Amino acid sequence: MSSLSLVTPVWRREVALCALQCDSVDRHLSCYVKHHVIVPDDDLALFDRFNGVRRVVVPASELLPAWLRPMPRLLQHKGERYWWSLRTSPVSGSHVERIVKIAAASALAEDRHCILDPNIVFFRRFDLSPLLRPRPAPLVVTSLAGSPLQAQRMRTSRRLLGLTSASLPAIDFGGPIAVWDRRTARAMIERIEMVTGTEWVEALCCARNVCESMLYGCFVHDSVRHCAEHVPTSQTHCLRFAAAAPDRATIEATLRTAREDEVACSTAGLAATSIDKLSAVLAAQAEQEARVAPAAVSPSAVVPA
C-alpha cells in the first residue's frame, strides 16, 4: 500500500513557526503516515516537545554524511551557520538544508514525501490521499520570469544532471509545498553521481546556486519514465498576504476569501506581530469548529434503538 510523509527542515529561530505548523497539520491534514521534523543535532532539546504518535524530530546527522559537520555557532556569518569538511569549502546552513531535503526524500521509508517550508501554516482540511501512488505526483511549474538567480540555479541543475543547456525551457519548479517521489529522488541522486563521478552530497557542496526543487524538476522533465509519474500544475495550494503587517481583520478576510484550492498560507515576510495575529485567528477558528461539531449531532438526528 502506498504511503506518504510530511517533511519539514527547521532551525532554532523557527521554533514558534514550527509549533504553529504542527498544530495546523494535526488539525487539518489527513492520509499521511508521519511528520518528520528535521533539526540540527544540537537543537534536539528545543524541538523534543513536538515528538508524538505521528511526528518525529529527526537529527540532521541521520541524513548527512559523517564527514560534513556543523561549525560552532560562534563562527556564524551574517546570522547563518556553516558546515565544514575536509572535502569541500564550508557551506551555508541554507545550502545544507537543500541537501537535507533531498536526503530525506530518498532515505525516509514512505513512498512519497510532502516537503513543507517551516513558514507554511494550514487553515483548511487537506486530504493528501490524491498524492499517493499510483496517481501521478503534482510538480509545480512556473515561469522563471527573468530571475537571474533562478537562471543560475537552472544552469547549475543542468550541469549536475548532465543536461544540455537547450534541453529545458525557462521554467521553475519551486513551491512552498512540494511532493517528491522516493524512487525519483533516488534515481536523481544516481544521475548526479554518474555525471559528476563523486558522492552526490560532495558534488552539491562543491556547486554554487544549488536549488533542490530545480534539480528535482529538471530531472523529472528530462526523464521519460519519471515524467510519466508526475503531472505539471500551477497550483501551490498556498496563499501569501499582500502586506507585510496585515491586521487581524485583513488576515480573517484573506483566509475567508481564499480560493478553494488554497489550504495553507505562508508567513514568509510577515512581521512578528502579524504572525501572532494569525495564530490568534487560527486558534479562534479551532474553537469555533469545536463548538460547531457537537451541534452537528442534534438529539433529533439520533435514531432510537
Range-by-range predicted roles:
Residues 1-23:
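N-proximal low-complexity "stem/linker" segments adjacent to membrane-targeting elements
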Residues 16, 42-48:
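Short, charged/polar "capping" segments at the starts of alpha-helices
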Residues 23-32:
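Short, acidic, metal-binding catalytic loop of nucleotide-sugar glycosyltransferases
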Residues 36-40:
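Short internal beta-strands
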Residues 46-106:
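Active-site-proximal specificity loops/subdomain of glycosyltransferases
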Residues 100-139:
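GT-A fold catalytic core of metal-dependent nucleotide-sugar glycosyltransferases
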Residues 126-202:
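Conserved catalytic core of nucleotide-sugar-dependent glycosyltransferases
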Residues 193-305:
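A glycosyltransferase accessory/donor-loop signature
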